[in-house]
Regions:
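N-terminal charged segments
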Residues: 5, 17-24, 28-113
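Short amphipathic alpha-helix that is part of the acyltransferase structural core
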Residues: 30-49, 131-162
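A short, internal acetyl-CoA/4′-phosphopantetheine-binding micro-motif in the GNAT/acyltransferase core
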Residues: 81-87, 202-209, 237
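Conserved acetyl-CoA-binding loop-helix of GNAT-fold acetyltransferases
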Residues: 90-94, 210-224, 244-245, 249
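Conserved beta-strand-loop-alpha-helix junction that forms the acyl-donor binding cleft
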Residues: 107-111, 224, 233-244, 260-266
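Conserved active-site alpha-helix within GNAT-family acetyltransferase domains
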Residues: 112-117, 215, 238-256
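Conserved catalytic-core motifs of GNAT/GCN5-like acyltransferases
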Residues: 118-130, 235, 253-266
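A conserved beta-strand-loop-helix scaffold within acyl/acetyltransferase catalytic domains
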Residues: 163-173, 178-203
């Protein structure tokens, strides 16, 4: 997740339109009535401090590649890597071996970087939890399958919601909306730590934005998550305050932990 710090970014506008809101000409106008404060984290959500690690040690263990105490998703599934909260020198060497020079990973606030490792400037994320989200099924949302991956990949390439790899669909349920047989919007499940499921890849074709497809799909995916007794979770680029505020408008709340810093392997 790369933060945009240059005012009202294309990514902000794109995600706002995906969710079906029209926010005027300025970020302030779009978010005037929304609460962007970080909620007090009084719920038992510690597993979310390291969601990739938790997922790869539970529901997603079949996708894991390990070296010592460092674990990552298989490279055609997801870009996420799990690392201990307070990495040892050996952990950093294991990261280097797994990711290679130039690889990037998120680390928690407690991680002390070894000499020569630097934070990626302008990169960071926020985490939002959906304890108040019940979700709403959507009769128009269709279940996407591996046969749809080429079309899903093309939609992601056009809309840039974040990485979507050849086997990302295996991580969970993906729903889409079609017009004249063509996939024009989608959202689905990614990280799956115990008790939680992340909603990701929320995107809408440019020609169909502003119609609420993104909002409907987020709520439809959330409904499925709730049906199996789990709680929805989302991540967003720290600079994308437009999307963050609108996810809050749907009922998500910002956590005071769980936002990674990003590091590039030297």
């Amino acid at each position: 997740m790369v933060a945009d710090t240059a005012g009202w970014a294309d990514g902000d506008r794109r995600q706002i339109e995906d969710l079906g809101f029209r926010g005027g000409d300025s970020r302030g106008e779009a978010l005037r009535t929304l609460d962007l404060t970080i909620a007090d984290d009084g719920t038992p959500t510690r597993v979310l401090d390291a969601p990739a690690m938790a997922a790869l040690n539970s529901h997603h263990a079949r996708f894991a590649e390990r070296r010592g105490d460092v674990v990552r998703y298989q490279t055609d599934v997801s870009v996420w890597t799990g690392i201990p909260a307070q990495p040892t020198p050996q952990d950093w060497e294991d990261v280097r071996a797994l990711l290679g020079s130039g690889g990037m990973l998120g680390v928690g606030a407690a991680a002390v970087l070894p000499e020569g490792w630097e934070l990626v400037e302008g990169a960071g994320g926020v985490q939002l939890t959906g304890e108040a989200i019940e979700g709403v099924p959507d009769a128009e949302a269709v279940l996407l399958t591996p046969d749809d991956v080429p079309e899903m990949t093309a939609l992601v390439e056009r809309t840039k919601p974040g990485p979507f790899l050849p086997r990302t669909i295996e991580l969970g349920t993906y729903l889409g909306i079609r017009r004249d047989g063509r996939l024009v919007a989608m959202a689905g499940e990614r990280l799956h730590p115990p008790g939680w499921t992340e909603i990701s890849a929320v995107c809408t074709d440019e020609a169909y934005r502003g119609q609420g497809f993104g909002r409907r799909l987020v709520l439809a995916v959330a409904h499925g998550i709730r049906e199996r007794g789990e709680t929805p979770l989302m991540h967003a680029a720290a600079g994308n305050t437009g999307a963050i505020g609108l996810y809050q408008h749907l009922g998500f709340r910002l956590r005071d932990r769980g936002a990674p810093r990003f590091v590039r392997v030297p």
